[in-house]
From Swiss-Prot:
It comes from Erwinia tasmaniensis (strain DSM 17950 / CFBP 7177 / CIP 109463 / NCPPB 4357 / Et1/99). Binds 2 manganese ions. The lineage of its organism: Bacteria, Pseudomonadati, Pseudomonadota, Gammaproteobacteria, Enterobacterales. One of its GO terms (cellular component) is cytosol. Its EC number is 5.4.2.7. Belongs to the phosphopentomutase family. This is Phosphopentomutase. One of its GO terms (molecular function) is magnesium ion binding.
Length: 407
């Protein structure tokens, strides 16, 4: 029986990569800076004391972080017995965004440059805005700028509810985001608007990675909240991922938990399970692992590390999330049977101590656990695609164009 379980702790970087300087991210270290803040007693809101991650540490997280950054994260046990394979990897892809990281994990690095809306005000071309107003029959639009998703709701949410004008905004990522109130604007109407935007961006040659529906609820500034009904409309990966190969070459199953299906534009996915929040994502993952058949991948993205704590620069929240994940990790490990492998990794960094609100260019951890996996140091990997190549080799698929297998 061969099954692989891939857990992406979204944004869980472990130290800036060699090329971080060109992204303005030299010195960033998501794990390291969280651990240091906890150790200094500066992250005691909702939790207390040094960062406590015994199960991730036993899989080699501390050792991988030390190899990446030169510093062992304070609070973790330097003398823990290592029961997993560990490594750290740098990104070959040109960006530090979610699709690039995930596609590269699945063996397909993004070697082209995404399009971006780089102007912080009046960010979108007028012809694009006019087209959206016309095609979607809109009374106008709000935003048209770079913004944090929560800040823009406080600024424009009330006006949106009154006027019916959707809020358009972007960031340093290759994204076009649309925020609308679930009740006054309507969720299905928001999704339909995002489909129109996706088509317009693709046909217009803007080369934008994702259109993101950002529904929210609430009745006044300070009370607006984004809901779990986010929907990402991504372009398709430029080549077959290891997920698609498993389905096409072996008739295998690929089960998406959380936003994985959206990230791969639903290509190479045979089942989708929606869940919102760390515990709910964990529960759904446990359920799918219990029933996953032979020749299957269960692939989960734990988005809260990025969206709730990384972008919002919430160090105590990120630390508490990591500790919750670590407490529940033995539930996943107990479901790993003979022939199975469990892979824990990330897609980029999002250092909550770093200036701004954007992702950070960092190494990612690669932690692998299973009865047939030799524990120990698997060194530095020069592309996330080593994960995809490992999966291709493990399942007996045709090799990927990039990456070297771990074993």
């Amino acid at each position: 029986m061969k099954r692989a379980f891939i857990m992406v702790l979204d944004s869980f970087g472990i130290g800036s990569s060699k090329d971080a300087e060109k992204f303005g991210d030299k010195g960033s270290d998501t794990l390291g800076h969280i651990a240091e803040a906890c150790f200094r007693g500066e992250a005691d809101k909702g939790r207390k004391g040094p960062l406590h991650l015994p199960n991730l540490t036993a899989l080699g997280l501390g050792k991988a972080a030390e190899a990446s950054s030169g510093k062992f994260p304070p609070g973790l046990d330097k003398n823990a017995e290592i029961i997993g394979a560990y490594a750290y990897a740098s990104e070959l892809s040109s960006g530090k965004d979610t699709p690039s990281g995930h596609w590269e994990i699945a063996g397909v690095p993004v070697l082209f440059d995404w399009g971006y809306f780089s102007d912080t005000e009046n960010s979108f071309p007028q012809e694009l805005l006019d087209l959206l107003v016309e095609k979607a029959n809109l009374p106008g639009y709000l935003g048209n700028c770079h913004s944090s998703g929560t800040v823009i709701l406080d600024q424009l949410g009330a006006e949106h509810m009154k006027s019916g004008k959707p809020i358009f905004y972007t960031s340093a990522d290759s994204v076009f985001q649309i925020a609308c109130h679930e009740e006054t604007f309507g969720l299905e109407r928001l999704y339909a608007l995002c489909e129109i935007a996706r088509e317009a961006l693709t046909e217009g040659g803007y080369n934008i990675g994702r259109v993101i529906a950002r529904p929210f609820v609430g009745d006044k500034p300070g009370h607006f909240e984004r809901t779990g009904n986010r929907h990402d409309l991504a372009v398709e990966p430029p080549a077959p991922t290891v997920l698609k190969k498993l389905v096409d070459e072996q008739g295998g199953e690929v089960i998406s938990v959380g936003k994985i299906a959206d990230i791969y534009a639903h290509v190479g996915i045979t089942k989708k399970v929606k869940a919102t929040g760390l515990d709910a994502l964990f529960d759904a993952t446990v359920g799918e692992m219990k029933s996953a058949p032979d020749n299957s991948i269960v692939f989960t993205n734990f988005v809260d590390f990025d969206s709730a704590w990384g972008h919002r620069r919430d160090i105590p929240g990120y630390a508490a999330g990591l500790e919750l994940f670590d407490r529940r990790l033995p539930e996943l490990m107990a479901l790993v049977k003979e022939g199975d492998i469990l892979i824990l990794t990330a897609d980029h960094g999002c250092d909550p101590s770093w200036p701004g609100t954007e992702h950070t260019r960092e190494h990612i951890p690669v932690l692998i656990f299973g009865p047939g996996v030799r524990p120990g140091d698997y060194g530095y990997r020069d592309t996330f695609a080593d994960i995809g190549q490992t999966l291709a080799h493990y399942f007996g698929l045709s090799p990927m164009a990039y990456g070297k297998p771990f074993f």
